[in-house]
Amino acid sequence: IEIAHSLCLTERQIKIWFQNRRMKWKKESKLLNSSVQSAGEDEEKPTE
């Protein structure tokens, strides 16, 4: 509520902003985890 007042926004706008940030963070962390795992799998394959 205090954040909303200080930024001259509604509580709803603040809630949506935080929700969007959480979704973006989840998406980015999922992409990072999948890229790290695929890189790790490449390293584990034996080379001839």
From Swiss-Prot:
CDD domains: homeodomain (cd00086). Transmembrane segments: none annotated. One of its GO terms (molecular function) is RNA polymerase II cis-regulatory region sequence-specific DNA binding. The gene is hoxb6. This is Homeobox protein Hox-B6. Its main location: nucleus. Sequence-specific transcription factor which is part of a developmental regulatory system that provides cells with specific positional identities on the anterior-posterior axis. Pfam families: Homeodomain.
